[in-house]
Amino acid sequence: MPTVLSRMAMQLKKTAWIIPVFMVSGCSLSPAIPVIGAYYPSWFFCAIASLILTLITRRVIQRANINLAFVGIIYTALFALYAMLFWLAFF
């Protein structure tokens, strides 16, 4: 009667082929967007949109007279959040 560890080892052998698939899934061409004859990476547009949204958020927070602690960390986190959301939504 197989033990729990031997059953787990058999399952791992059955699914071991998946690991190389995930390792090479990022080896495709990078998404580039042509703008006036030049190709720019899509992360560049996500960063620009994220910067604009972060500045808008900063303006809203300033107009609401909200004082934030750790401003640098908060705006950096907002920038990263917006960039990842744009990447997820559009690419």
Curated annotation (Swiss-Prot):
<keyword id="KW-0732">Signal</keyword>
<feature type="transmembrane region" description="Helical">
    <location>
        <begin position="33"/>
        <end position="53"/>
    </location>
</feature>
<protein>
    <recommendedName>
        <fullName>Uncharacterized protein YtcA</fullName>
    </recommendedName>
</protein>
<keyword id="KW-0812">Transmembrane</keyword>
<dbReference type="InterPro" id="IPR031381">
    <property type="entry name" value="YtcA"/>
</dbReference>
<dbReference type="GO" id="GO:0005886">
    <property type="term" value="C:plasma membrane"/>
</dbReference>
<dbReference type="Pfam" id="PF17090">
    <property type="entry name" value="Ytca"/>
</dbReference>
<keyword id="KW-0449">Lipoprotein</keyword>
<feature type="signal peptide">
    <location>
        <begin position="1"/>
        <end position="26"/>
    </location>
</feature>
<keyword id="KW-1003">Cell membrane</keyword>
<keyword id="KW-0564">Palmitate</keyword>
<feature type="transmembrane region" description="Helical">
    <location>
        <begin position="70"/>
        <end position="90"/>
    </location>
</feature>
<feature type="lipid moiety-binding region" description="S-diacylglycerol cysteine">
    <location>
        <position position="27"/>
    </location>
</feature>
<comment type="similarity">
    <text>Belongs to the YtcA family.</text>
</comment>
<keyword id="KW-1133">Transmembrane helix</keyword>
<feature type="lipid moiety-binding region" description="N-palmitoyl cysteine">
    <location>
        <position position="27"/>
    </location>
</feature>
<keyword id="KW-0472">Membrane</keyword>
